[in-house]
UniProtKB/Swiss-Prot annotation:
One of its GO terms (molecular function) is ATP binding. GO terms for biological process: gluconeogenesis; glycolytic process. ATP binds at K211, G299, E330, G356, G357, D358, S359. It holds the Pfam family PGK. Belongs to the phosphoglycerate kinase family. It comes from Frankia casuarinae (strain DSM 45818 / CECT 9043 / HFP020203 / CcI3). It is an enzyme of class 2 (transferase). Pathway: Carbohydrate degradation; glycolysis; pyruvate from D-glyceraldehyde 3-phosphate: step 2/5. The keyword rRNA-binding does not apply. Keywords: ATP-binding, Cytoplasm, Glycolysis, Kinase, Nucleotide-binding, Transferase. It catalyses: (2R)-3-phosphoglycerate + ATP = (2R)-3-phospho-glyceroyl phosphate + ADP. GO terms for cellular component: cytosol. This is Phosphoglycerate kinase.
Amino acid sequence: MRTIDDLQVAGHRVLVRSDLNVPLDRSGDTPRITDDGRVRASVPTISALLDRGARVVVSSHLGRPKGEPDPKYSLEPVAGRLAELLGRPVAFAGDGSGDIAGAHAREVVAGLGDGEVALLENLRFAAGETSKDAAIRAAFADELSALAEFYVGDAFGAVHRAHASVADVPKRLPHAAGRLVLTELEVLRRLSSDPARPYSVVLGGSKVSDKLGVIRALLPKVDALLVGGGMCFTFLAALGHGVGGSLLETEMIETCKELLAEGGERIVLPTDVVVADRFAADADTAVVAADAIPAGWLGLDIGPASTELFAARLAGAATVFWNGPMGVFELAPFAAGTRGVAEAVAAGKGFSVVGGGDSAAAVRTLGIPEDAFSHISTGGGASLEYLEGKTLPGLAALDV
């Protein structure tokens, strides 16, 4: 896989596919980025290219605008933050239309000098970006490719998507992987190939079905698999426990029984949970044993004893991978489990990886220092699919 060091970019236009898909607070007059982690992660690649005299054209998606312009998903607010982090102006090439690489964008890009940068409008304003029709996708890839002479893939969070800007454009231009993609791959290889032991994995989130592939891939490799979040209730049901009104995938119970039989004592489930009479921050709550959830009550977090149990299992780990919150951390009464696990991972002396998505958001929301972890991934789904051993379209396109 080529790197940006292999490209002679001085004086040339370089299309960089970054991942600037950040959350925006739109409650005020001006949209405000609430978590700029992905913007910051994109800077090393862009800065390196600019320092070498490239004329950089940054592209990204934001949210799911359904293939047509939607002002609330505009990347314009991100251009300002990117300029602050780069320490130089960023020309925004959007004009409010879905013509992402049209006349206005071409004019902005043509006006770039060496060491200057522009940001295209949200790629997903164009139906061709995510189209299942290869011809439609190819036509949009042709438009994007016409803007540049080189392509750099640096959107690790999107490499599992067969989208035009991720998988089709690199077939049309000399290409390389960006700094972020290379860093993410190095980290994931450490997790999947001969990790230092003991190796503990913490999985949370809502559904077993969403994590089944990674569970099956990692279970033979780990010393402990700690299961929290909504998915733990299907495992508890597989043990014969009632789970009240908690999230339950009945179709996955038999699968969980098989996993429990395979994993034995290496699969660690909560011993207590925080339950509520309804899904609300002001609900009545209680801490109950994991096998004594009252009928109609919802399990919304792991309990304090479970948090201590998980922390103890993490304390001596040489390698830790954490993906998925332990509860509904966005609501204060159900955040303690996620905070406790995050703090335990952060306090460990081994190699610790936070697996993107909601886990990364939880770290920042709860105010835990990011530098306490060895790595916070920008790719939730991409990280999991890599660990499952799947072929990721965006990586396959760069590796030729």
